[in-house]
Amino acid sequence: MSLVYMNIMTAFTVSLVGLLMYRSHLMSSLLCLEGMMLSLFVMATLTILNSHFTLASMMPIILLVFAACEAALGLSLLVMVSNTYGTDYVQNLNLLQC
């Protein structure tokens, strides 16, 4: 494995550990999820470019679409929770009812 792949895997691992450790605030969780999605995007792009696998060249774009949808839903949930309760604690999400 080259140094670039090791750095990307380290970025993914740090984001995953951050997601597992700092779960109290919704904003911290969303930032860690974005870091994970960014490292997955870079890893998929580099893997496809290095292997010349042209059939899967759309996969990073699809991953970016899912990341954008996840970010939009997460931010809308963050705005709704912070307007309702005044804080962005994840424990307030258990109180939400449809």
UniProtKB/Swiss-Prot annotation:
What organism is this sequence from?
Answer: Hydropotes inermis
Q: From the Swiss-Prot or TrEMBL record, state where the protein is found.
A: Mitochondrion inner membrane
The kind of enzyme this is, by top-level EC class, is translocase
Listed under subunit, the entry gives: Core subunit of respiratory chain NADH dehydrogenase (Complex I) which is composed of 45 different subunits.
- Family classification: Belongs to the complex I subunit 4L family.
What EC identifiers does the entry list? 7.1.1.2
What GO MF annotations does this protein's record show? NADH dehydrogenase (ubiquinone) activity
- Which reaction does this enzyme catalyse, per its entry? a ubiquinone + NADH + 5 H(+)(in) = a ubiquinol + NAD(+) + 4 H(+)(out)
For membrane topology, the record states: Multi-pass membrane protein
Taxonomic lineage: Eukaryota, Metazoa, Chordata, Craniata, Vertebrata
The alphabetized list of GO BP terms reads:
ATP synthesis coupled electron transport
Entry keywords, A to Z: Electron transport, Membrane, Mitochondrion, Mitochondrion inner membrane, NAD, Respiratory chain, Translocase, Transmembrane, Transmembrane helix, Transport, Ubiquinone
| GO cellular component terms, semicolon-separated | mitochondrial inner membrane; respiratory chain complex I
The entry's protein name is NADH-ubiquinone oxidoreductase chain 4L
Output the InterPro entries linked to this UniProt entry: NADH_UbQ_OxRdtase_chain4L/K, NUOK/Mnh_C1-like
Functionally, this protein is described as follows: Core subunit of the mitochondrial membrane respiratory chain NADH dehydrogenase (Complex I) which catalyzes electron transfer from NADH through the respiratory chain, using ubiquinone as an electron acceptor. Part of the enzyme membrane arm which is embedded in the lipid bilayer and involved in proton translocation.
Which residues are listed as membrane-spanning?
A: 1-21, 29-49, 61-81
